[in-house]
From Swiss-Prot:
Recorded family membership: Belongs to the polyribonucleotide nucleotidyltransferase family.
Residues that bind Mg(2+): D482, D488
Reaction catalyzed: RNA(n+1) + phosphate = RNA(n) + a ribonucleoside 5'-diphosphate
BP GO annotations: mRNA catabolic process; RNA processing
Protein name, UniProt field: Polyribonucleotide nucleotidyltransferase
Species the sequence originates in: Heliobacterium modesticaldum (strain ATCC 51547 / Ice1)
Segments forming domain S1 motif: 618-686
Gene3D superfamilies: GHMP Kinase, N-terminal domain, K Homology domain, type 1, Nucleic acid-binding proteins
MF terms in GO: 3'-5'-RNA exonuclease activity; magnesium ion binding; polyribonucleotide nucleotidyltransferase activity; RNA binding
Annotated TM spans: none
Gene Ontology CC terms, in alphabetical order: cytosol
Top-rank taxon: Bacteria
InterPro entries: ExoRNase_PH_dom1, ExoRNase_PH_dom2, ExoRNase_PH_dom2_sf, KH_dom, KH_dom_type_1, KH_dom_type_1_sf, NA-bd_OB-fold, PNPase
Enzyme Commission number(s): 2.7.7.8
Length: 709
């Protein structure tokens, strides 16, 4: 067993190897504060046959024992990964994937199991560092190591791995990963932070990453295994030459077709023709012929952009595709927006619910629920394909979370807008950057629904083609540029600053110059898109949809909650039955009343106010007789509150029998004459009758005399 440690932000990171999971290719027990994550990395001995990609799998396993919880439900064990676990797995996958040899086809599986959680020390960051350590110590050919940190900013001061208390005050949540030389991955949510400040935060994080990488290099020198020799996929040089000679300029001409579907059809036609022509000369090598064609396609696109400064669809480097904006296209939904950018189209729908509709979270974090959520769907027809539809995959969950994070800073607080908000983005057409189109569509549907968002938000995806020291930054990348390029850098924000960032790259890092130019170009594009959106809808609708619930909030004394609910829910169920509203009661006394009919909601408010009102001595009430005894009648003066009219207080004259004056169900006006020490209410009908007795004929009442003067 060997143990290595270093300090990060005043807390000790300890990497232990050689004690746990020794049969894995590489394994470490990573501890940061009281957060402990077991990370293993294992590679298959032989390449997987018949594939043209690198089969890397990253699993992030949350164990609820890490926070002292027993899983809910009947089975009482962890089930499918939570959304947070999927996002954490993606966070680990993205910076390590570009760092394996080209042509490496062996299966590699990284498993990060969270075993103990200290809320001040993020387990996903520990898992990321642990994954790099496990791969670097193993015999798997990994070209790392990498480091990862969380950057926050409180009162203008940048912080590494902020504590939970600091994170609550921070105006950014920025995850940075990279090698000692360059940034590999960025994932951020921010509260309208200027682009220049985001660059500073990224580079600040990278300085700490360089320390973490140096620490791992020292560790590998002591405890690392020799890297195994693995066969890398090689193409027959004769086959490659034959393909290139046969294709000539055919592929270049096909690539320069500006329409996606026509271009794809033209490219497929060239590929089919080439395969049919060369397969007799190179039997059983169809896959390799297609691989060479794919390589040529990538080379042509990259040369067009970097040398000829021409994009496949003819746009300039910073030109954005034609934009179309529509709102309110679905009649019965609470809000809807259709955002179209070129051949990318997203329909976003906003649904408003009550506080009872919020999402309950059962994970390792301290957050137990959320009232704003965004879900993203990517059906196969959006790209003209067929495939089974079996629920959201990792990509869809990641895109939904990114769009959710982009809008979070502008969502009104619960006090300002007491609704649960669900957004759903349907990517109905895709040619690149549907996640950023989802951000734009979200703004449209929120404003169409009448949600008082603080500012509109738009998003844009930037691309990069880098050849040596030369690079080109592309605005609003389409599918081909994303697939064949080196970077997908998504930026969302308002006119005043960035609210979300996500950067994935396929090369071994990007520097400050590239990041700066990409963010500056993204801002220009974002403002252009915002102008197009605001020309159609420039502020939230004044009136909500008639099909959306109207929510009225009120507060009562928490001690009176039981009076509103009643025994076995009798009182509250009666209110719901009478008014048709939906009622949610919080422990602090806040009551949310929801109804599509405002008058019904107001009626429920009046009933609750009467239930929680205190009966006052000397005040006159009108109520119904509920019970008759031989000594008097009980009258309900307020809902759930009864008082007694003693037989002697029923009338001015002597009453022999209670039923001679009142019967059950009669409405009577009474005055509260006493509330005794036991809380019993004594009423008088006699006092009311006396007060209402006509004045003596011929005389003037004092109040009338006053009015005469």
């Amino acid at each position: 067993m060997q143990v290595f440690s270093m300090e990060i932000a005043g807390r000790t990171l300890t990497i232990e190897t050689g004690r746990v999971a020794k049969q894995a290719g590489g394994s470490v027990l990573a501890r940061y504060g009281d957060t402990v994550v077991l990370v293993t990395a294992t590679g298959s001995k032989e390449p997987r046959p018949g594939i043209d990609f690198f089969p890397l799998t990253v699993d992030y396993e949350e164990r609820l024992y890490a926070v002292g919880k027993i899983p809910g439900g009947f089975i009482k064990r962890e089930g499918r990964p939570t959304e947070k676990a999927i996002l954490s797995a993606r966070l680990i996958d993205r910076p390590i994937r570009p760092l394996f040899p080209k042509g490496f086809r062996n299966d590699v599986q990284v498993v990060a199991t969270v075993m103990s959680v200290d809320q001040d020390c993020p387990p996903d960051i520990v898992g990321m560092i642990g994954a790099s350590c496990a791969l670097s110590l193993s015999d798997i050919p990994f070209e790392g190591p990498i480091g990862g940190v969380l950057v926050g900013r409180v009162d203008g001061k940048l912080l590494i791995n902020p504590t939970m208390e600091q994170a609550e005050k921070s105006d950014m949540h920025l995850v940075v990963a990279g090698t000692k030389d360059a940034v590999m991955m960025v994932e951020a949510g921010a509260n309208e932070v200027p682009e220049e400040d985001m660059i500073e935060a990224i580079m600040f994080g990278h300085q700490e990453i360089q320390r973490i990488v140096a620490f791992q290099e020292e560790m590998v020198a002591v405890a690392g295994k020799p890297k195994r020799e693995v066969p890398l996929k090689q193409i027959n040089p004769e086959l490659e030459q034959a393909v290139r000679e046969y294709v000539g300029d055919k592929l270049r001409n096909a690539i320069q077709n500006p329409d996606k579907l026509s271009r794809e059809a033209d490219i497929q036609a060239v590929m089919k023709e080439t395969v049919e022509a060369l397969l007799p000369h190179f039997p059983e090598e169809e896959k390799d012929i297609r691989t060479v064609l794919d390589t040529m396609e990538k080379e042509i696109v990259r040369k067009l952009i970097t040398v000829d400064k021409q994009r496949p669809d003819g746009r300039k480097m910073d030109e954005i595709r034609p934009i179309s904006v529509e709102v309110g296209i679905l009649p019965r939904t609470h809000g809807s927006g259709l955002f179209t950018r070129g051949q990318t189209q997203v329909l976003n729908v906003c649904t408003l619910g009550t506080i009872a509709d919020l999402q309950i979270l059962d994970g390792l974090g301290v957050e137990e629920s959320k009232r704003y959520m965004h879900h993203y769907n990517f059906p196969p027809y959006s790209v003209g394909e067929t495939r089974p539809m079996r629920g959201p995959g990792r990509r869809e969950i990641g895109h939904g979370a990114l769009a959710e994070r982009a809008l979070l800073p502008v969502i009104p607080s619960e006090d300002e807008f007491p609704y649960t908000i669900r957004l759903v983005s349907e990517a109905v057409e895709s040619n690149g950057s549907t996640s950023m189109a989802s951000v734009c569509g979200s703004t449209l549907s929120l404003m169409n629904a009448g949600v008082p968002i603080k500012k509109p938000v738009a998003g844009i995806a930037m691309g990069l083609i880098k050849e040596g020291e030369h690079f080109s930054i592309l605005s609003d990348i389409q599918g081909m540029e994303d697939h064949l390029g080196d970077m997908d850098f998504k930026v969302a924000g308002t006119a005043d600053g960035v609210t979300a960032l996500q950067m994935d790259i396929k090369i071994k890092g990007v520097n400050r110059e590239i990041l700066t130019q990409a963010l500056q170009q993204a801002r220009k594009g974002r403002l252009f898109i915002l102008d197009k959106m605001l020309a159609v809808i420039d502020k939230p609708a004044a009136e909500m949809s008639p099909y959306a619930p109207r929510i009225i909030t009120m507060s009562i004394d928490p001690d009176k909650i039981r009076e509103v609910i009643g025994p076995g829910g009798k009182v509250i169920n009666k209110i719901i039955a009478e008014t048709g509203v939906k009622i949610d009661i919080e422990d602090d006394g806040r009551i949310f009343i929801a109804a599509t009919d405002t008058e019904a909601a107001n009626k429920a408010v009046r009933i609750i106010e009467s239930i929680t009102a205190d009966v006052e001595v000397g005040k006159v009430y009108t109520g119904k007789v509920t019970r008759i005894m031989n000594f008097g009648a009980f009258v309900e003066v307020l809902p759930g509150k009864e008082g007694l009219i003693h037989i002697s207080q029923l009338a001015e004259e002597r009453v022999a029998k209670v039923e001679d004056v009142v019967k059950i169900g009669d409405e009577v006006t009474v005055k509260v004459v006493e509330i005794d020490k036991q809380g019993r209410i004594n009423l008088s009908r006699k006092e009311v009758l006396k007060a209402n007795k006509p004045a003596v004929t011929g005389g003037a009442r004092p109040d009338e005399m006053r009015r005469r003067f």
